């Protein structure tokens, strides 16, 4: 994992704002949180303290919007645990899901020929890849090639196959890439260099590198939700932990990276919160609620 030297009770580390002051003046009306490595603890649960801080923020008049790389269907257990009924940005920004009504409002599909060409080029460069895909729509599932293993596959009713052609039997939202010897950073760089026009690559978590349609990210998805609520970037405080959160944190009025996060994300943050296992989101929300920076 990454730097986890920040522990509960230690002072928060702050870094200079990105050209604009984000002191106690602004009132943040939207709290945007990633799930894995941010709102969720390492055991994929939300702490009572974090639940309490989110309830306080809501009572103060702030909206909470989940912004995650997970497909909407993979978020359902967390919507239940959080009693979450608002709009959620899923699939790295390519899906908007109405949790209250249980409806996928919009989504996109990966360009299959472009994805296949990218994978051929990448395999020629780095050698064998272990692959999985997430199929499109509300009934999304993992289709997983032998050799690929992720702990959260069970949430999307995985179908495992030794035949890579079966990855493409249904429309696909994204491809998950894994290499047995390359680091995540090295695989991400190589995949970006090999990506066909119209595709992009994100490093979404430990051993999670994803091939996605270009033009969508967590910032574009959250901007769409914020507009529907009559809000702008300046109204938003955002929390994340991985490089796929960089667009989100750059867009938001105040950017908070978790202490357990990736160095590239910390470099663009206004503030470093305690780690996800140390109630980092809760600590920041409690502080800004106490000083009146939430409504």
Where are the regions a protein language model picked out?
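Short active-site oxyanion
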Residues: 61-65, 84-86, 174, 234-236, ...
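Residue-level signal for inorganic ion chemistry
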Residues: 37, 57, 68, 92, ...
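Conserved acidic, metal-coordinating active-site core of Asp-based
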Residues: 125-239, 243-251, 260
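Short, structured coil segments at secondary-structure junctions
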Residues: 82-85, 91-92, 100, 194-197, ...
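N-terminal glycine-/serine-/threonine-rich phosphate-binding loop
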Residues: 15-34, 38-64
């Amino acid at each position: 994992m990454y730097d986890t030297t920040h522990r509960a009770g230690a002072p928060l580390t702050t870094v200079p704002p990105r050209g604009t002051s984000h002191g106690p003046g602004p009132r943040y009306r939207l709290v945007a949180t990633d799930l894995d490595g941010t709102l969720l603890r390492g055991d994929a649960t939300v702490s009572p303290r974090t639940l309490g801080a989110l309830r306080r923020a809501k009572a103060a008049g702030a909206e909470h919007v989940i912004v995650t790389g997970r497909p909407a269907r993979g978020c359902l257990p967390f919507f239940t645990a959080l009693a979450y009924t608002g709009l959620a940005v899923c699939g790295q920004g390519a899906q908007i899901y109405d949790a209250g009504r249980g409806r996928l409002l919009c989504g996109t599909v990966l360009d299959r020929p472009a994805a296949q060409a990218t994978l051929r080029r990448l395999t020629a460069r780095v050698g064998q890849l272990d692959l999985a895909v997430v199929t499109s729509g509300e009934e999304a599932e993992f289709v997983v090639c032998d050799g690929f293993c992720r702990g959260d596959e069970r949430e999307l009713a995985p179908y495992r196959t030794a035949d890579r052609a079966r990855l493409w039997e249904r429309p696909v939202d994204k491809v998950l890439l894994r290499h047995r010897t390359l680091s995540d950073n090295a695989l991400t760089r190589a995949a970006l260099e090999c990506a066909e026009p119209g595709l992009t690559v994100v490093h979404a978590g430990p051993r999670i590198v994803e091939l996605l349609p270009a033009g969508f990210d967590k910032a574009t998805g959250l901007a769409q939700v914020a507009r529907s609520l009559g809000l702008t970037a300046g109204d938003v405080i955002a929390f994340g932990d991985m490089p796929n959160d960089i667009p989100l944190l750059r867009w938001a009025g105040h950017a908070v990276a978790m202490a357990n996060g990736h160095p590239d994300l910390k470099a663009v943050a206004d503030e470093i919160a305690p780690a996800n296992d140390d109630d980092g989101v809760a600590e920041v929300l409690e502080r800004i609620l106490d000083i009146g920076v939430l409504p």
